[in-house]
A protein has these predicted regions:
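Bacterial N-terminal signal peptides
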Residues: 8-18
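Short, solvent-exposed loop/beta-turn-alpha elements that line the ligand-binding surface or hinge
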Residues: 49, 53, 203-214, 280-289
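Pocket-lining segment of extracytoplasmic ligand-binding domains
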Residues: 87, 168-260
């Protein structure tokens, strides 16, 4: 009888060891936007399998619209929204959606630029001018207008705004349909044939406005609360994977360019330009200064009429990030 039991036990152990790793790994559904600047970070995470290397079984859910991940997490269709718009993340938390903001992943990086031959010499000269920027309601728009107001004394009534996406704004500027534009560095790198002059950095001006060292946060990672409660270690591992991906991208920009060529059907030149902006665009941090920067941003959005309620302090959960820093 004992021999039979030993044989059965050995068989069960052998069967367990023969189960493929993905079936043993913690499952999670992760959504990200594949048409914006979150594409770079998301593609590297997905293609290089950083989360899987932490023992996670990830189903990547891709969205064609910027608010797709936040809408999906509201309905609990995904467990994690990666690089979701920061203002929307705080907005759904303020509305009572059971989510936790656990990581800052993308910087609201942009430059205020004019054509090289423009008579405009400084940001203060933009009074009465037409400025191209992201549409009202976006985090970048709220940040840019707040900087113009607080740092340069330019009220919204002092200039007109031409809204558009990055490609449209670049075209407006090159065709002299606007006097200045608020454009991301990756866009500027892709239109090198157009000679531009930089008047100011959104990141630098934000730090003056917020009186801190944290950059303005464009995107965050948010987790459905029930998933986090049941799988705290899995979320910490995902954040650790994100931190590893950040370092990889910084050190392997040519490889990032190759990934982007395939993932986004970019030309080699555009993919290289995109990859070279990695260090200025992405982060994987959730320190007190990052949270303070997020809250300051949301205050600005509220002041502009884009929100009415504050996200509760409990929506900012540093626990997973703290645990992730102890994981290799």
């Amino acid at each position: 009888m004992k021999i039979t039991k030993l044989i059965v036990a050995a068989y069960v152990l052998a069967m367990a060891l023969s189960v493929p790793d993905p079936l043993l790994a913690q499952k999670m559904k992760v959504g990200y936007w594949t048409s914006g600047f979150s594409l770079g970070f998301g593609s590297v995470m997905e293609q290089m399998k950083f989360a899987e290397s932490q023992g996670l079984n990830v189903e990547w859910v891709k969205f064609a619209v910027v608010n797709g991940p936040t809408r999906a997490i509201v309905s609990n269709a995904i467990d994690i929204a990666f690089a979701a718009p920061s203002t929307n993340s705080m907005g759904i938390a303020a509305d009572g959606v059971p989510v936790k903001i656990v990581l800052a992943t993308q910087i609201a990086e942009a430059q205020i630029v004019v054509l090289d031959g423009s008579p405009i010499k400084a940001v203060g000269d933009l009074k009465g001018k037409k400025i191209g920027m992201s549409p009202a309601g976006s985090a970048t728009h709220a940040i840019a207008t707040a900087i113009l107001d607080h740092n340069f004394g330019l009220k919204p009534s002092d200039y007109s705004v031409a809204p558009g996406n990055e490609a449209q704004l670049a075209q407006f500027l090159s065709q002299k349909e606007i006097d200045a534009g608020v454009l991301r560095s990756v866009t500027l790198a892709q239109i090198e044939e157009t000679k531009l002059r930089r008047l100011g950095s959104i990141v630098d001006e934000w730090k003056k406005l917020s009186k801190g060292n944290a950059p303005p946060i464009l995107a965050t990672t948010i987790v459905y609360s029930d998933y986090l409660t049941k799988n705290p270690d899995a979320v910490a591992k995902f954040i650790a994977a994100t931190r590893n991906a950040l370092q990889y991208g910084s050190k392997n920009k040519p490889r990032v360019g190759e990934i982007l060529q395939k993932a986004a059907n970019m030309t080699a030149a555009d993919a290289r330009a995109y990859a070279n902006q990695w260090d200025g665009a992405y982060i994987a941090s959730f320190e007190p200064a990052d949270i303070a920067s997020l809250k300051k941003m949301y205050d600005i959005v509220k002041a502009a009429g884009g929100a009415t309620k504050d996200a509760p302090d409990s929506a900012f959960d540093t626990g997973p990030y703290t645990r992730a820093k102890k994981i290799n």
